[in-house]
């Protein structure tokens, strides 16, 4: 375990306030000037443990005044900002791909909070002065260096003091016609989760994130790759603070700059660009660089006021776990809000309705329009995201980085258990563990564990203690070994066994049925449509088809009609309802493994015998 150097920075706040100034983030009409001065302090006890020499401290504090009141901004380096196998790529003039593994672990990007404030957060870069934002008493403040001869001068200002580059509200390309009804949102508030579901929701989840920068953005920043990389790092650092509220950690696994030419046809039609980017990720990127989710940053002006688009509920999908983002603002907080919004769609979250107002005076992340940066998901978004996780259980987000994969020096207090640590419950201020010593990241006397499904009262649970209940007919319970705090790997019943009173057959631990799929897509009080609705799948047009091939809808054979588009009905309605997303032809299709007849299941959009696939 390596203890971090604690440094206090005193900011001398001068009574000068500027009336208007042009900063990197745009025109600011009211600001304060401050002068940081660094004062090093030893850790508690007056002893500093030896640690590898780094350019940037692991932990820093900044003291300054806001509205005449002193505050202390506590910051800790964002330890997991980059994955262990992070790479960068650009292209030579002759088109050759040049991939490097730069040393990025000694970086200058921090997360933090105002001390003694429960509802506070911060995202700051300290690469060249202090640049970023922090939340204090419900207000968002920004700090950035003033480009004056006095290099220590910084400006502090409120979000409301930044003049808008364009007053027109920015929107997401996921249109209202593609939304689900309000009913699932209202009923979501009535959900009561089982203990097993609650445990799953509380487990830390990870997204290995890849960013591609198009040629227009490369030229916009005057072909300056270091400036582009710094902007992307700042964006991902902010994105991390936002997604942390959903218990996600974003690890940047790769960045590539299309410095020679674009790898796809980036066009003003945002839907076409998203589709092309998804295909490029599937065919070109994934074979050479694994990732859970990828976003394209572009300087093209999408049609209308659209600044981004993503497929709904598509995380971990090979083709659809993507988004396209217009780099439309100088302000990283604005663009990062859009990145979080589109990633929210990938995480199964739709746009907020008018009733979703739990973000104070600011708009929530999933608001339909944006004129100001946002940093919070509404309670509606959180519930919808939880429904998505419990329904789809995307597997890629559970890949926790191994301790040995973390190559930077261990930092006690960052919630990551690293080499030399037995536990990590956060800083002494935040730690709520009775088993872990927050100052040393070692287990307390006689404690065997600190956390985990098989850890109880600081001891390993007994052999045979149930740590994960069976989720349904197709799952099996897991039990503790008595030698570890972790629950054994999830196992399930073999594929093809009958489930849910013979309504379906087990498939990879789930019991896919038409009824359950209708409820998942449209909420409660829905049923499967009558059989005649499924004959529409023989037409090969509208919402009746089995697959897409070269942009054309391929009809189902008569025996396969219940393996194509899913048709549902509300209550006693006779209407044949189907759900379509223009950018995702697989949305609303009958799932693989669904029963389509006695002893028959859907496989590759065909109704086949159980014995041929299981």
From Swiss-Prot:
One GO molecular-function annotation for this sequence?
A: toxin activity
Which cysteines pair up through disulfides? They are 316-396, 356-380, 359-364, 412-441, 423-436, 425-431, 435-458, 449-455, 454-480, 467-487, 474-506, 499-511, 518-568, 533-576, 546-556, 563-602, 596-607
* Sequence ranges assigned to domain Peptidase M12B in this UniProt record: 205-401
The record, for InterPro entries, names: ADAM_Cys-rich, Disintegrin_CS, Disintegrin_dom, Disintegrin_dom_sf, MetalloPept_cat_dom_sf, Peptidase_M12B, Peptidase_M12B_N, Reprolysin_adamalysin
Q: Where are the transmembrane segments?
A: none
Query: What is the recorded function of this protein according to its Swiss-Prot or TrEMBL entry?
Result: Snake venom zinc metalloproteinase that inhibits platelet aggregation and degrades fibrinogen.
What protein does this entry describe?
Zinc metalloproteinase-disintegrin-like BmMP
